[in-house]
């Protein structure tokens, strides 16, 4: 195609791989174009040409569209073949094989393979998967009118925050963020007058908790979100920042700004939400407050003490010091922001957490941003929909509705929604199903593109290996090992964090592969799937009955159960290391220093015997030995003779002296170090 405009530059990319650029003088009528196009026609076949006049502030401009092909090998010219004509537009899928594409267009497969080669796509074959980008290009060249189906666009997270709300003030949604073990959950205990922190596994938060707390004798409310501080839960912290109206950044006075604090600050800045800093453990003597001010400033947060706008409030959650001041700071900031929402608007909110409860089904913790959630409403979130069956507050009490700024547990989901999904109201079940159908189509198209790329690489690699013979195939299969994993978790947030940690595991060409993740207990199907695929099973936060452990043992399947993320990570790393090809290592068993050299007459020559003192371990005659000089290994071999005084011995322990005759080597000097060692295989350090 080509375009003629006032810039007088025409670029034509020939679809068979040929590119040229031609300068044209600016013309205002079609007749003058023939003078400039004629020279090209002698060298190329002109398939078609169309010229349109476009309106432009500087006067009408001509839009020139042409199809040129090499005259010696035109794209449209195939001897004895005519392209089919069709009056109806051709709808092409996101991905299809060359053979299917040829069958759909009723065009010989070999023709399409040749044209793909001319487009620069090499190593193609009938099973090769091509995307819509290339199939539509070829179809248009073959004379077909191609159309692409319009996809439904679901509301995005940005649409939730971009809308300017009206109506009464609503409770602010406040997220607590900070480094692990800096006191976030203990601070929430102080707000709720509860003891959450003492009941959490490993003393750390591993999912987002959401609940509404009354203040000023019930006249005001704040909805709090607690986020995990452990490094494995970055996605949860990012989600917490995106959902929040205000963030309370918790920094421990005795620890200062740490890695997860810095990461939390980046999420806060990315989400562009106001922040209040809570300085915990500030009642401890020697707290370097000014140093923490500087650390925060270096990461983009300027507190009021340094001339900025960010409040920093020293508190002690255990004694209650500073808690009223922190509450007042949050409520004052919320009043300044005028956070409003009408309960009469259509509902929109966030999925904070979701889980499956035995006997109850799928549920999700929802924070309402606008509108009201009531029983009987139809909701969509991500790839799931729900007819609200029941609503439960943080105290496990059934409620009739959830107002803006409040959080509650919503029951009735057909499938488990994913934490972080935008939830919104629809009018009916049929509308919910239609929306999900379009969402799945969009998702499948993206999956198809990824699948096409992956499968094409595998098929091309397999063909190359086949051409190279059995040795290449053996080599290819020997290095393509994977560490297969099936993971079951108590909720979607934990599942997300665990998947993010497991997927990047790699050492050399061995890498982890998460075959399946799900919410709920380990089932017999999971064990059978693990046995078939040589996978381990991880149960995180979901207790495993003894019968399930026995079943896994019967099927020779390794099953891990943990409530604490860092304990789980340690065990996964150990198991991953066992799947790696072992490496040969040398373990030193004894070490001696040469303090003197003795010349001994042998049968045909004089040999040098090392007079040594054993400084570490035991020198074993049967072990291999190496000579180290200036921290470099000079020689490695065997011991010919090991003597204590004049007696031949098999070993010499630390602290004793001996004479060592090396086999076929006597270039020794005083001060050299002799080390005996054994060679053994072990998993590589990971």
Swiss-Prot record:
Keyword field: GTP-binding, Initiation factor, Mitochondrion, Nucleotide-binding, Protein biosynthesis, Transit peptide
Keyword Transit peptide recorded: yes
Protein name: Translation initiation factor IF-2, mitochondrial
Region (G5) location: 316-318
Family note: Belongs to the TRAFAC class translation factor GTPase superfamily. Classic translation factor GTPase family. IF-2 subfamily.
Region (G1): 178-185
Main location group: mitochondrion
MF-aspect GO terms: GTP binding; GTPase activity; mitochondrial ribosome binding; RNA binding; translation initiation factor activity
Disulfide partners: none
Region (G4): 280-283
Protein's cellular compartments: Mitochondrion
Chain residue ranges for the region called G3: 226-229
tr-type G domain sequence ranges: 169-344
Region (G2): 203-207
Pfam families: EF-G_D2, GTP_EFTU, IF-2, IF2_N
GO terms for biological process, alphabetical: mitochondrial translational initiation
Residue sites binding GTP per the record: 178-185, 226-230, 280-283
Protein purpose: One of the essential components for the initiation of protein synthesis. Protects formylmethionyl-tRNA from spontaneous hydrolysis and promotes its binding to the 30S ribosomal subunits. Also involved in the hydrolysis of GTP during the formation of the 70S ribosomal complex.
Gene Ontology cellular component terms for the protein in this record: cytoplasm; mitochondrial matrix; mitochondrion
Organism superkingdom: Eukaryota
């Amino acid at each position: 195609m080509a375009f003629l405009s006032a810039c007088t530059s025409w670029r034509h990319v020939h679809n068979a791989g040929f590119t040229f650029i031609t300068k044209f003088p600016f013309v205002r009528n079609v007749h003058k174009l023939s003078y400039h196009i004629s020279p090209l026609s002698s060298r190329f076949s002109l398939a078609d040409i169309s010229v349109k006049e476009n309106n432009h502030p500087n006067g009408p401009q001509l839009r020139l569209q042409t199809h040129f092909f090499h005259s010696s090998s035109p794209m449209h010219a195939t001897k004895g073949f005519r392209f089919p004509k069709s009056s109806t537009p051709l709808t092409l899928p996101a991905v299809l094989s060359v053979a299917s594409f040829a069958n759909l267009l009723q065009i010989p497969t070999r023709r399409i393979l040749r044209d793909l080669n001319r487009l620069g796509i090499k190593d193609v074959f009938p099973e090769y998967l091509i995307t819509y980008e290339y199939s539509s290009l070829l179809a248009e060249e073959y004379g077909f009118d191609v159309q692409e189906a319009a996809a439904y666009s679901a509301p995005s997270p940005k649409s939730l925050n971009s809308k300017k709300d009206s109506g009464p003030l609503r409770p602010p949604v406040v997220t607590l963020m900070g480094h692990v073990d800096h006191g976030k959950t203990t601070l929430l205990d102080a707000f709720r007058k509860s003891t959450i922190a003492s009941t959490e596994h490993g003393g750390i938060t591993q999912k987002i908790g959401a609940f509404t707390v009354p203040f000023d004798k019930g006249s005001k409310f704040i909805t709090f979100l607690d986020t995990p501080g452990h490094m494995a839960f970055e996605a949860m912290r990012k989600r917490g920042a995106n959902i929040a109206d205000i963030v309370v950044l918790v920094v421990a006075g005795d620890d200062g700004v740490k890695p997860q604090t810095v990461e939390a600050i980046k999420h806060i800045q990315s989400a562009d939400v106001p922040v209040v800093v809570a300085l915990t453990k500030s009642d401890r003597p020697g707290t370097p407050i000014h140093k923490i001010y500087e650390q925060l400033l270096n990461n983009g947060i300027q507190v009021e003490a340094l001339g900025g706008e960010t409040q920093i409030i020293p508190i002690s959650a255990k004694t209650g010091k500073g808690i009223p001041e922190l509450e007042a700071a949050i409520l004052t900031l919320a009043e300044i922001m005028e956070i409003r929402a009408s309960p009469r608007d259509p509902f929109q909110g966030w999925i904070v957490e979701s889980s499956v409860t035995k006997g109850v089904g799928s549920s999700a913790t929802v924070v309402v941003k606008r509108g009201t959630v009531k029983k009987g409403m139809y909701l969509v979130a991500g790839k799931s929909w729900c007819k609200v069956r029941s609503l439960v507050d943080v105290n496990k009490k059934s409620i009739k509705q959830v107002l803006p700024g409040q959080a509650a547990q919503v029951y009735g989901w057909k499938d488990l929604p994913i934490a972080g999904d935008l939830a919104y109201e629809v009018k009916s079940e049929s509308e919910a199903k239609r929306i999900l159908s379009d969402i799945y189509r969009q998702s499948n198209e993206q999956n198809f593109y990824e699948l096409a790329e992956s499968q094409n690489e595998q098929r091309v690699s397999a063909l190359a290996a086949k051409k190279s013979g059995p040795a290449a195939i053996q080599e290819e299969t020997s290095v393509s090992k994977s560490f297969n994993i099936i993971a079951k978790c108590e909720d979607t947030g934990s599942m997300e964090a665990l998947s993010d940690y497991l997927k990047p595991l790699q050492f050399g060409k061995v890498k982890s592969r998460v075959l399946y993740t799900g919410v709920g207990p380990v089932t017999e199907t999971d064990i059978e799937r693990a046995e078939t695929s040589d996978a381990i099973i991880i149960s995180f936060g979901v207790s495993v009955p003894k019968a399930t452990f026995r079943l896994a043992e019967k099927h020779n399947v390794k099953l891990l159960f943990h409530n604490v993320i860092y304990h789980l990570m340690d065990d996964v790393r150990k198991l991953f290391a066992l799947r790696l090809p072992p490496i040969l290592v040398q373990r030193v068993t004894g070490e001696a220093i040469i303090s003197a050299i003795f010349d001994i007459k042998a049968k045909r020559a004089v040999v040098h015997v090392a007079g040594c003192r054993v400084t570490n371990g035991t020198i074993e005659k049967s072990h291999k030995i190496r000579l180290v000089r200036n921290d470099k290994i000079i020689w490695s071999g065997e011991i010919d003779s090991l003597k204590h005084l004049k007696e031949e011995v098999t070993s010499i322990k630390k602290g004793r002296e001996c004479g060592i005759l090396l086999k076929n080597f006597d270039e020794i000097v005083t001060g050299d170090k002799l080390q005996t060692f054994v060679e053994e295989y072990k998993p590589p350090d990971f």
